[in-house]
Amino acid sequence: MARTTPIERYRNIGISAHIDAGKTTTTERILFYTGKSHKIGEVHDGAATMDWMEQEQERGITITSAATTCFWKGMDGKFPEHRINIIDTPGHVDFTIEVERSMRVLDGACMVYCAVGGVQPQSETVWRQANKYGVPRLAFVNKMDRSGADFFKVYEQMRARLKANPVPIQVPIGAEDKFEGVVDLVKMKAIYWDDASQGMKFDLRDIPANLVDTCKKWREAMLEAAAESSEELMNKYLEEGDLPEADIIAALRARTIASEIVPMMCGTAFKNKGVQAMLDKVIELMPAPTDIPPVKGELENGEAGERQATDEEKFSALAFKVATDPYVGQLIFFRVYSGVVNSGDTIYNPVKGRKERIGRILQMHANQREEIKEVRAGDIAAAVGLKDVTTGDTLCDLNAPITLERMEFPEPVIHVAVEPKTKADQEKMGIALGRLAQEDPSFRVRTDEESGQTIISGMGELHLEILVDRMKREFGVEANVGAPQVAYREAIRKEVEQEGKHAKQSGGKGQYGHVWIKMGPNEAGKGFEFIDAIKGGTVPREFIPAVEKGLREALNNGVLAGFPVVDVKVTLFDGSYHDVDSSELAFKLAAILAFKDGMRKASPVLLEPMMAVEVETPEDYMGDVMGDLNRRRGIIQGMDDAAGIKLVKAEVPLAEMFGYSTDLRSMSQGRATYSMEFKHYSEAPKSVAEAIIAKK
């Protein structure tokens, strides 16, 4: 089967934004205009096509990023048909992991901002993730019809808060209830959409007289940004004072793909204005899979390799999401970087070292699906029948293994104990939790050794609440949930040398292991580092892995309160052995003893997770909010003003933030909102640490 759309006409984009910027509505409109959904789905009435889990429709927030394919020929049909694969990403900070994984497989992103709220905390997080993966971006300022809408304020915020280089390529005609359309600065024409056809039809008119000067000013800024793409274009611009349309588009495209500029557009998705023009810009300015550097990975021999985005290249793909589907079981969403794969093919997963057979391949449209026979470079699809694939795994040709760069997933910061309500739920709960953990790498499940309880960990209260809810709905498991607990850590502050000796001589073969270690603090976030500095075989080669294993085991339970120990550097520098009595077990036990004794002397401290908290509050409640954050041991980092709303930034220990949403609601009569994300671990004050240790 030949390719239906050339790869140059593919656009793999994400739509990403803060919670209420109107991202799902924007995606719905895209599906409507591209003819994939015949009736517009409104989030307000819980019918949005993209939000397909029951909970999303109830809560009106997007939890899983659904992938959808649609086709577009331009507002006036001027382009050959382009294929746009859209990944809708969640805006709630507890689901940052979803954003992170979709960023990894996108070629470009459309950042949706609310014209009133502007750049909000989650927007900054998403921006950082897009920077990390080098994703080119467009900005769409939505909700221009809302009171307080201000396109240029969002422009300033993008510069100040995101340190971005936004370039408006449209100017709004009016704002709030007077918002009528946009001026296209490339064509210098005003675009008005027709309400009766829900924006399917439009008119091009002259620019309203009161906007001519504004448009000239912003067009000049846009031309300068375009001209900076090359010396030759700059000279042409300086000589002629203007540039032809084709040159402007080509130059803006080159600079957007290089992540040097972020073209800005505006509209109101809800009122069917602006999304159509944004789609045109996705085609004109966003990269095709062939416009970005070839994907990099590691070959079987450990050397660096890459794969070109062509059908002739060997097959390679990245699994970026695992979802359980009520009809077909487990779906693995994957992005094909190179080559072709057919349903029924056997492929290789180098991360797990397993062969897998692809049963069926489905092209997704929100939660409707179409079965297809093959997928090619640039495609995003879902596979059924893969047995052991986790998010971030590579799928590739059996005869040309390559492991694509893996994704990094954050460590969970909050955990709760869950207990099945009945004996019958016990086994089902184990299966359900295993499934959910496979779908979501930021969710962990373990059994507490002391209490025998099942502990689940995640990125925040909402994250865990939704997972427990899914357990009930999708797997029919009723569970009791304990109070949330903070994931504390332990660390050391001093460098010490310590001996560890395990010797038992009781007739027959004894046990003998003896080590000297030097242990000290490692850089924050570096984790555990083991250095083998044995000279002259005082500890034989074959026992050194056992020493490291013992140390890693000892890290699981610190000496203060049994929390995991982080950021420690341990050097094994001396020891002794016995020809007959030494064994791996003896050296492992000696290492554990040395670590425990050494840690007691190395000024152990308790670390607690600190959260970056941003509160938006009307001025009247400012005093209460600040006072309350101080009481919660918060450190105020800064304050900002936005249209009569005060923005307070603080760093607060997670332990003090439980139940904050309820307290904030009552303190501000429901008018203040907040967002919070994990920042880093820091040393808990002495009084706090003592109280936690005493509880243990």
Swiss-Prot record:
Compartments, record wording: Cytoplasm
Gene Ontology biological process terms from the UniProt entry: ribosome disassembly
InterPro entries: EFG_II, EFG_III, EFG_III/V, EFG_IV, EFG_V, EFG_V-like, EFTu-like_2, G_TR_CS
Disulfide bridges in this chain: none
Main location: cytoplasm
PROSITE patterns linked to this entry: G_TR_1, G_TR_2
Keyword Protein biosynthesis in record: yes
GO cellular component, one term: cytoplasm
Database matches in Gene3D superfamilies: 3.30.230.10, 3.30.70.240, Elongation Factor G (Translational Gtpase), domain 3 (3.30.70.870), P-loop containing nucleotide triphosphate hydrolases (3.40.50.300), Translation factors (2.40.30.10)
Keywords, ordered alphabetically: Cytoplasm, Elongation factor, GTP-binding, Nucleotide-binding, Protein biosynthesis
Annotated GTP binding sites: 17-24, 88-92, 142-145
Pfam families with a match to the protein in the record: EFG_C, EFG_III, EFG_IV, GTP_EFTU, GTP_EFTU_D2
Matches recorded under PANTHER family: RIBOSOME-RELEASING FACTOR 2, MITOCHONDRIAL (PTHR43261:SF1), TRANSLATION ELONGATION FACTOR G-RELATED (PTHR43261)
Entry's family note: Belongs to the TRAFAC class translation factor GTPase superfamily. Classic translation factor GTPase family. EF-G/EF-2 subfamily.
Protein name from the UniProt record: Elongation factor G
Source organism per UniProt: Thiobacillus denitrificans (strain ATCC 25259 / T1)
Encoding gene (name): fusA
